[in-house]
C-alpha cells in the first residue's frame, strides 16, 4: 500500500488535499498574486489563479464525495471540465433541496439555471453575470473549449422541476428520472472526452440509472419526510406497504425489505448491463464510468444488510472505496 500511496493520484485520494497542490495537478495554471488588482481585471485574475476551479472541486468534495474521488482519477486533460460539470449539477440539486423550500422559490431558482445555460453558450464578447459566478464561469470555459450538447445540460435542470413530494408511479418512471439526471451527466462527460460511440452511450444510460436509483435509496433515511421515498407506488401496492413504513425502515418489517429489494434489483440489473458493455467501450473513456465501483459497493452492502436502509454499513462512508477506485483505475476497468 505504501508504494501505491507514492502515486500522485493515490495521494490525492487518501489525503483529500485541496488548494494549490490539487489545482496544479488538475492542469490549471497558477499565476503569482499581485497586491493591487483593478476592479475590471478581478475576473481574469481569478481565472488565472484557478479560483473557479478550486471552488468547483470544493463543492463536489463536500456534497458529492464519491464522485469527487472518481473525478480525481480521470485523465488530467478531462479533470477540470469534469469538476465544472459536477459542480454545476451539485448547485442545481442544492437549489431545490432543503427544509421547506417553497415551490415558487424553487421554480425561480431553476429558471435562473435555465437562463445561465443559455448565457454560457453566448459569445465571449457578451458579458453577463456568468463571469461573477465561479461555477458558471468554469462551465462557460468548458462549453467554450468542448463541444457539449445543451440538451443534456438542460435535462439536469428540467428533471429537478419534479416536486420532491411527488411519488414515482412505477419503476419505469423512476428510471426515466435517473436517466434525465445521472445519465445526462455521464453523457456530458463522454462529450468532454471527445467520444461519440453508441456502446459508450448505452453504458452511460444504464450506469446512470443504476447510480441514480442507488443514490435515491441512500437518501431515504436522510431525507425523512421532506420528500417522498423513491419506492414507486406500484411496488408499495404490490407488497401492501405504506410510505411511512418505508421512511421508518424497521429491521423486522418484511414488506419494506421486499420493496427495497425490488428497487435495488432494478439498479443492479442496469449495473450489470453497463458492465456487459465494458469491452465495447473505448479504453480512453472507461475511467468516466468509475462511479460503477461505488454503486456496486453500496448495493452489495445493502444486500448483506438484508436491504435495511438504516443499517450502519449503508449510511456511512465506505472507507475502502478509495482503494477500490484506485485499483480499478490501474486496471482501466469499471
From Swiss-Prot:
Entry's Pfam families? SQS_PSY
GO CC, sorted alphabetically, is: cytoplasm; cytosol; mitochondrial inner membrane; mitochondrion
> Out of the domains of life, which is the source?
Eukaryota
Q: Which Gene3D superfamilies match?
A: Farnesyl Diphosphate Synthase
Q: What is its main location?
A: mitochondrion
Q: Hey, what tissues is this thing expressed in?
A: Expressed in the ventral nerve cord, larval brain, motor neuron axons, imaginal disks, and muscles (at protein level).
Instruction: State the similarity comment.
Output: Belongs to the NDUFAF6 family.
Q: How does it assemble?
A: Associates with mitochondrial complex I assembly intermediates during its biogenesis. Forms a complex including sicily, ND-42 and Hsp83; the complex is necessary to chaperone ND-42 in the cytoplasm before mitochondrial import; the interaction between sicily and ND-42 is direct and occurs preferably between the unprocessed forms in the cytoplasm; the interaction with Hsp83 is direct. Interacts with ND-30; interaction is stronger between the unprocessed forms in the cytoplasm.
What's the protein name? NADH dehydrogenase (ubiquinone) complex I, assembly factor 6 homolog
What organism does the record attribute this protein to?
A: Drosophila melanogaster (Fruit fly)
Encoding gene per record: sicily
Amino acid at each position: 500500500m505504501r508504494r501505491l500511496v507514492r502515486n500522485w493520484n493515490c495521494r490525492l485520494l487518501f489525503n483529500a488535499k485541496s488548494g494549490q497542490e490539487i489545482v496544479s495537478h488538475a492542469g490549471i495554471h497558477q499565476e503569482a498574486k499581485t497586491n493591487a488588482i483593478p476592479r475590471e481585471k478581478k475576473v481574469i485574475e481569478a481565472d488565472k489563479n484557478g479560483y473557479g476551479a478550486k471552488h468547483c472541486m470544493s463543492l463536489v468534495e463536500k456534497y458529492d464525495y464519491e464522485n469527487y474521488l472518481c473525478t480525481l482519477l480521470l485523465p488530467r486533460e478531462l479533470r477540470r471540465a469534469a469538476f465544472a460539470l459536477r459542480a454545476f449539477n451539485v448547485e442545481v440539486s442544492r437549489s431545490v433541496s432543503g427544509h421547506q423550500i417553497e415551490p415558487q422559490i424553487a421554480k425561480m431558482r431553476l429558471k435562473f439555471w435555465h437562463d445561465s445555460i443559455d448565457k454560457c453558450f453566448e459569445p465571449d464578447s457578451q458579458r453577463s453575470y456568468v463571469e461573477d459566478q465561479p461555477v458558471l464561469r468554469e462551465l462557460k470555459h468548458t462549453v467554450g473549449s468542448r463541444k457539449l450538447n445543451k440538451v443534456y445540460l438542460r435535462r439536469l435542470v428540467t428533471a429537478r422541476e419534479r416536486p420532491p413530494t411527488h411519488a414515482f408511479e412505477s419503476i419505469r418512471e423512476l428510471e426515466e428520472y435517473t436517466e434525465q439526471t445521472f445519465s445526462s451527466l455521464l453523457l456530458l462527460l463522454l462529450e468532454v472526452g471527445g467520444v461519440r460511440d453508441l456502446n459508450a452511450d448505452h453504458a452511460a444510460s444504464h450506469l446512470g440509472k443504476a447510480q441514480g436509483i442507488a443514490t435515491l435509496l441512500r437518501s431515504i433515511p436522510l431525507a425523512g419526510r421532506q420528500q417522498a421515498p423513491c419506492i414507486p407506488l406500484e411496488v408499495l401496492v404490490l407488497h401492501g406497504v405504506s410510505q411511512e413504513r418505508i421512511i421508518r425502515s424497521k429491521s423486522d418489517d418484511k414488506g419494506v425489505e421486499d420493496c427495497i429489494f425490488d428497487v435495488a434489483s432494478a439498479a443492479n440489473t442496469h449495473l450489470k448491463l453497463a458492465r456487459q458493455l465494458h469491452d465495447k467501450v473505448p479504453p480512453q473513456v472507461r475511467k468516466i464510468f468509475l462511479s460503477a465501483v461505488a454503486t456496486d459497493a453500496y448495493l452489495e452492502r445493502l444486500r448483506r444488510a438484508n436491504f435495511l436502509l438504516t443499517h450502519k454499513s449503508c449510511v456511512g462512508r465506505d472507507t475502502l472505496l478509495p482503494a477500490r477506485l484506485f485499483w480499478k483505475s490501474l486496471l482501466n476497468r469499471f
